[in-house]
Amino acid sequence: DLDNVWKNKVTSCQLLNAAMLPGMTAKKLLVAEFRVLVNVYHYYINYVNGLSDYDKRIVQDAANDVFKYESYSKRIADFLINPSNGYKISNCVYCDTVNVSPFPGHKRRIRRFQTDHVLNRGACPLVALSLHNFVPSCNICNGANLKGTNTIGDTIEEIKHLSPTNPSYNFWHKVLFVVNPKYSWVSDNKKSEHPEHYEIDFYYKDKVYAKSVDLFCLKEKYNNDYLN
């Protein structure tokens, strides 16, 4: 039981106990809504940033001992690819262009997706095992050159709004794709003949989603994949 593991750890590391958002427990973190996880994340970050480097390392190590992602990563992935658990995984949630759906192998289902942590588990180990902190993504979007350990927004509210695991997330209805001529002399009816004369751009009903487009280089990716 994760709560017992937590209690045992804070007995030997009192500093860790103060790192948890009041009212939250280790077990509740596993299924907490994403908006709650963001509050936990920022509470933890603010707390450890106020500690000395030595005490910060102690808290980080203690938190990692409780929320051991490496020990549970396979179990988490197996849970996500099991259709009976209600998850339907097809394309990368971030770019929607790379097929990451699992497929049947000889003995078990094979996964193609990576379980991206929306909130960086390295900065806050408390959210390392939280179900709503996982986004099935492709290795490109989850790679160090794009998402990596970056945050998806600059403020608490932006991060809550931009996570695909938050019920308020509505990228595909708030962002419209348009194909525009690159040059004024280009005729608008010859896209199929000269796709290199056009570019994909975005119209935002909610401009906060421009941060996702920039973070995942979606304009560059879509233009490279579909118009070049």
Segment roles from a protein language model:
Residues 65-80, 116-123:
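Short Cys/His-rich Zn2+-coordinating modules
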Residues 1-75:
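N-terminal accessory alpha/beta regions
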Residues 132-228:
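Domain-exit/linker segments immediately C-terminal to small folded modules
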Residues 99-133, 147-160, 167:
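Histidine-centered nuclease catalytic patch
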Residues 76-88, 126-131:
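Short, flexible, mixed-charge glycine/proline-rich loop motifs
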Residues 80-112, 138:
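Short cysteine-rich loop/turn motifs with clustered Cys
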